[in-house]
Amino acid sequence: CGVSVVIHGADLDDLPGSACADHSPQGRVHTGQILEHLGLAAAANLAQAETLLQLQGLVYLPLSAWQPGLARIFALRESLGIRSSVHTLLKGLHPFAPQEAIVCAAVTHPPYLQRLQEFFLATEIPALCFRATEGEPFANPQRRPDLFLCHQGESRLLLAKDHASLAQLPELPDNLAASTSEFISAVLDGRRALPLAIAEQTAALLLLSGRCADLATARALLRQSFTRIAA
C-alpha cells in the first residue's frame, strides 16, 4: 500500500524456550520466523536494514542489530524464567527520529494500555495502540479490539472493539510458521480473504501514516490492493 514497514523483535537464535514460565511464549509463532519462511532475511545492522527497506519495503530488525544492550537484558528471560520491564520499554522504541515513523504498539494487560498511550503523547511519537494478540501487535482476527490513535497531542478511540456475535469463525492457519506464512501468501495473491480486523487495523495505520486522508480512503485503497477482504 505504499508504506515501508520495519518490524523489530527478538533475535531468532534467542527465542525463549522451555525455561520461561511467566507468560511463556514457548510454542508461539514469532514474526521473525514467519518472515524467514517468506524468504525475507533479517537485517544484521541498521545499514543493512535501510538497504533492505529500500529494496523490499519490509524488513525484520533483530534487537541485537540496533540495541545490543537491551538485547542482552531481554535474553535474561531464558535463564531467569520471568519477563522484565524491557518488554514494555521496547514497545515504544524504534530506530528513527520521533517524527520520522509511526508505531504500532500492543500490550497484553489492560492497565498498560493507558500507560502506553501516555508515553506516546509525552514523546510526541505517532502511534496506534491496542490489546495484543498472543503478545504480537496485530488485531485479533476473530474480534477487533479498541484501536486508539495517539497523534498531535491527543489520544482518541478511532475504532471501537467489535461486540457483534460471529456468524462464523475466520479461517485461520495452524500455529506453525510454515502454515502462517502460507496463509499470508494466500491472502496476498487472493486465494484467501484478508481478515476484517486486520484490514481495519491496516486502514488505521494508513491514516496515521498520512498515506490516506481518512478511513474511507484507506479502506478503498485496501480494496484495490487485496482482491478478497472478509466481511
Language-model-detected regions and their locations in the chain:
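A generic, well-ordered mixed alpha/beta core segment in the N-terminal half of proteins
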Residues: C1-L52, V59
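Glycine-rich anion-binding loops and their surrounding alpha/beta cores
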Residues: P16-G17, E36-L38, Q48-A231
